[in-house]
């Protein structure tokens, strides 16, 4: 299963690297062992018998961070990303939800804004990639 997840992440992140104009994109270098040893929770979305999307969740008592949300390019623009974000909102009772993406990743930014996230700040990574952090506060 970890190998399927790794292949899916690489297919999706290859597109994001192009969108960001990134020559050195760390998610594309993630080793198989990293998926297998992760303390985070992974969820998959299957379509037509294929792993079409997946997300990695880092859940804490008061906050839930969507560490990664990827959709295979063959399944782009089908509402799968929104379905996964909604799954998180429905299944985690956090006060705060966060997610990050490359600042130039228009499709991801659009998705997160439509799902009720608000931009909190932008920053530059050590690899020269401009990122944006989004947050959604849940009223308790």
How would you name each of these model-derived features?
Residues 6-33:
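Conserved GNAT-fold acetyl-CoA-binding loop/helix
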Residues 32-44, 65:
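A short helix-loop-beta-strand connector motif used in the catalytic cores of GNAT acetyltransferases and
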Residues 44, 50-58, 65-70:
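Conserved beta-strand in the GNAT
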Residues 68-71, 77-90, 110-114:
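Conserved acetyl-CoA-binding loop-helix of GNAT-fold acetyltransferases
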Residues 76, 99-109, 125-130:
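Conserved beta-strand-loop-alpha-helix junction that forms the acyl-donor binding cleft
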Residues 85, 91-103:
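Conserved GNAT acetyl-CoA-binding A-motif
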Residues 113-121:
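Conserved acetyl-CoA-binding loop of GNAT-fold acetyltransferases
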């Amino acid at each position: 299963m970890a190998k399927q997840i790794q292949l899916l992440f690489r297919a999706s992140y290859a597109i994001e690297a192009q969108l960001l104009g990134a020559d050195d994109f760390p998610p594309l270098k993630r080793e198989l062992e990293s998926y297998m040893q992760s303390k985070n929770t992974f969820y998959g979305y299957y379509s037509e018998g294929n792993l079409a999307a997946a997300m990695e969740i880092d859940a804490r008592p008061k906050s839930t961070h969507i560490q990664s949300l990827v959709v295979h390019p063959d399944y782009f623009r089908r509402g799968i990303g929104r379905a996964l974000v909604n799954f998180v909102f429905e299944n985690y009772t956090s006060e705060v939800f966060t997610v990050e993406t490359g600042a130039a990743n228009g499709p991801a930014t659009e998705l997160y804004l439509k799902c009720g996230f608000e931009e909190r700040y932008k920053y530059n990574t050590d690899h020269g990639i401009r990122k944006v952090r989004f947050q959604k506060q849940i009223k308790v």
